[in-house]
Amino acid sequence: MGLAATRTKQRFGLDPRNTAWSNDTSRFGHQFLEKFGWKPGMGLGLYPMNSNTSHIKVSIKDDNVGLGAKLKRKDKKDEFDNGECAGLDVFQRILGRLNGKESKISEELDTQRKQKIIDGKWGIHFVKGEVLASTWDPKTHKLRNYSNAKKRKREGDDSEDEDDDDKEDKDSDKKKHKKHKKHKKDKKKDKKDKKEHKKHKKEEKRLKKEKRAEKTKETKKTSKLKSSESASNIPDAVNTRLSVRSKWIKQKRAALMDSKALNEIFMITND
């Protein structure tokens, strides 16, 4: 496109290769490794020849193979190890027929198959116990004793003492067991008594609350009655306009009820 292409701005940071953190010797990891004898330039790993001198890089897993499958493929034992292809053993047999080594290749493939079965999921490896083999007598079908007669006598005496000690231990264990049972029963009784005591306290509190509620209800009722009686004795508040009108009506009624007042109004004289 040349100069006619669209221009795109690019901004580069101060550390485009992201190496500032690895070159910084004041970080905790750098100082911690130096305490164990590590120096810049040395690798990390079990073996110094195969140690990693560069940073650990993340590789993208773009297949459905399990973890460690690629490493297993790389570490092939021999030329007949079919780590990658499933039908490679058949191909090896065809090559063996052509080269005249069919028997050797078939034997090698059979041994590999047997080894796979043994090392598979249900394969079991039996390990002989050297201690059992050295102390077991196949004729008498008993364990061998290499001690002398004196030691046997001592062992017999020790066994008698041990039997007595075992009896004493059993008796003491029985006593301890009985004491433990009694202790458990006492604990259960104490728990029951505590529960009953708590229930009794709760019932007493509930009764007290009910009594208090009844008393408060009675006091409220009496206060309401007193307030109603006092309210009946208090006259109703009348507005000022109505009070003036009521006075005028009373005066008018009084004038109409009085005969003398009417005569004065109508100017009637009693001759």
UniProtKB/Swiss-Prot annotation:
GO terms of biological process kind: rRNA processing
Region (Disordered): 147-239
Gene Ontology terms, MF aspect: nucleic acid binding
Chain positions with Phosphoserine modification: S230
Compositional bias segments (type: Basic and acidic residues): 204-221
Cited function: Involved in rRNA-processing at A0, A1 and A2 sites through its action in U18 and U24 snoRNA 3'-end final trimming. Negative regulator of telomerase throughX competition for binding to EST2 with TLC1.
Subcellular localization(s) per the UniProt record: Nucleus, Nucleolus
Statement: the UniProt record of this protein carries the keyword Lyase: no
Domain G-patch span(s) in chain numbering: 25-72
Recorded coiled-coil stretches: none
Similarity comment text for this entry: Belongs to the PINX1 family.
Protein name, as recorded: Protein PXR1
Bias (Acidic residues) ranges: 157-168
PANTHER family: G PATCH DOMAIN CONTAINING PROTEIN, PROTEIN PXR1
UniProt GO cellular component terms: nucleolus
Keyword terms, alphabetized: Nucleus, Phosphoprotein, Ribosome biogenesis, rRNA processing
Any Pfam family: G-patch
The species this protein was found in: Saccharomyces cerevisiae (strain YJM789)
Superkingdom field: Eukaryota
Biased composition (Basic residues): 175-203
